[in-house]
């Protein structure tokens, strides 16, 4: 009886927290949709621009097909509710990903942990640059396509983790089909994941080819074909997004530096500090819990995929009229979120088993708490009408 009462109480707390989060997302996104945009309004975001694209009939992703009917059904509040549902879906999928780290934890407990760790953003520190510009984080509140991509991208990665171990013997075709469909659906929202995942998978398949001495070629070819539907969608999207003459993707070294001052990356102080502020927790896990982390294929592959995405963002740039859009940086954001899941999983697993020294766990816990508190402050600022791209007040103080 007492156990059932505790379980019901846990569910009540979980549902109340999720409801509060959903309400905050609906209110924030409604304000963003009412914003005139242009960067000067405190609630400026990409939401209004994507709505305008859909209203003009510019269809380049599944997002365009969803926000139009949502707007026709209930106006801006309809889109806000739709985005809140995707936020909740991302929290739920992240909670599913935590199952390996918390196998005995009840579902509401995993949902609460997922919600809390997904509030995290780059840590705040004096003279730390911008709250957003220059940072890499997994949870985004101002971009329609990313918000809708997130749950499907993580579902695709979790499905990949399930099918990959079957490569050595008989490939599980049912799991393979589910993974391929999810990867394709994720790409239909935004190509950010597959743009890094496909090269990372290619390297993985080449390594498997060498290791098995070409004895697993059939499975390797089948697995490689899983990205083809998504890549085909990338070409369709590119025909819409890069329709202007001179638009495309080029190496950053071929673009005159004076015409493209990087918003992110190592070319300015805010970018360098932003990257440093983004990786406090994952660096702590990698350095202090590295042995346990590197034993997990999911951790190694998610880190490699993130490294590929970061290299692409630093070395490639959109050209033509999309020069300053910096859309290639959505790749590191979504891949970091996948890597964030594995870093959190390693930390929780080591905490549950007590396998690591307590001081190492304490350092990692402090780093995670720093991220979460910073993220809560950032979200409160957004709700209060402080634009996400406004520099923090202490930037030029010291």
Features from the language model and the residues they span:
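Start-transfer (signal-anchor) and selected internal transmembrane alpha helices
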Residues: 1-28, 105-114
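Transmembrane-helix motifs of polytopic, lipid-linked glycan transferases
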Residues: 81-108, 155
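Perimembrane helix-loop-helix junctions
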Residues: 197-228
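Transmembrane helical bundles and short interhelical boundary loops of multi-pass, membrane-embedded
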Residues: 227, 231, 242-398
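Membrane-interfacial loop-to-transmembrane alpha-helix junctions, especially the N-terminal start
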Residues: 10-14, 106-113, 171-175, 217-224, ...
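Membrane-interface micro-motifs in multi-pass membrane enzymes
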Residues: 109-161, 326-336
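Short hydrophobic/aromatic helix or loop-helix immediately within or flanking a transmembrane segment
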Residues: 46-78, 84
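Membrane-interface alpha helices of multi-pass inner-membrane proteins
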Residues: 175-191, 197, 202
